[in-house]
């Protein structure tokens, strides 16, 4: 349930979210999203060093609703 919520919110923010059966989401966003979130004290997994992937590919864990909301708020903040 929480994975669907988080995926939907990322999609609303213009991110490409890939289907997942695991407790994390893989998505494509802005190439500098990792650096911007890091400045806000939030670390997401930059997947650009995975074979075949590029800058702007990320992975995040699906957590409790309040934690997912905090992450989404930080993403919204750095994208303003």
Short names for language-model regions:
Residues 32-38:
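Short amphipathic alpha-helix segments
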Residues 1-17, 33:
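Conserved PLP-dependent catalytic core of the aminotransferase class-I/II
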Residues 39-40, 49-80:
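PLP-dependent enzyme catalytic core of the Aspartate aminotransferase-like
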Residues 29-30, 64:
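Helix N-cap/beta->alpha junction signal
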Residues 3, 45, 59-61:
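Short, cationic motifs built from Arg/Lys/His that form the positively charged side of catalytic pockets
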Residues 18-24, 55:
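Short Gly/Ser/Thr- and Asp/Glu-enriched loop/turn motifs at secondary-structure junctions
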Residues 13-16, 43-48:
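A short linear hydrophobic-aromatic micro-motif
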